[in-house]
Amino acid sequence: TSTASKYPQPPYVGVIHRLDRPVSGIMVYAKNPKAAASLSTSLQQGKIEKWYQAVICGKPVDNNGTYVDYLKQDKKNNCSRIVDKSDPDGKRAELEYKVLDCMQTEEKDPQYLSLVEIKLLTGRHHQIRVQMAHMGHPLIGDRKYNLTGTSSPKLLLCAFRLSFRHPVTGKKMEFTLPVPEEYPLSSGKVL
């Protein structure tokens, strides 16, 4: 029998979440509508945990911490910005970060670069990029929010770990990627 007769309809692929176009990393897809509905509900309830790794400009004062801001999306210009908590269009944005590695560049005016692990506690439009830039640590390769220039043709932001409960069995599922090769830091030592 041919594949077409064995599978008369194309397979179902349910997109559960998205990544910004220049972001690399792990994505979750559902194999059927029931699983898609369950996973979408888990995502909305914050039961899908997402971690990212990014290379940022500078070195945060603290090696770990939490950023809480309010973001307002500008759909016309495909960007977001920090607004006051009182802004009715502002949505709470929270993330935790941890510095994994730090290095000094070998330029005429040396600067620090840091490899950070970020756990998203909310999922807002361009959240990591906006919040890190607002704190003075824009992402390397970010042409939208890194106004000081970029030293990489690619945005160094990767969704490297995802954790959730299987929609049918309830078993904890966790998926992890290694640090991308193009990242200039990976020793695990913080200066």
What are the residue ranges of the model-derived segments?
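RNA pseudouridine synthases
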Residues: 1-191
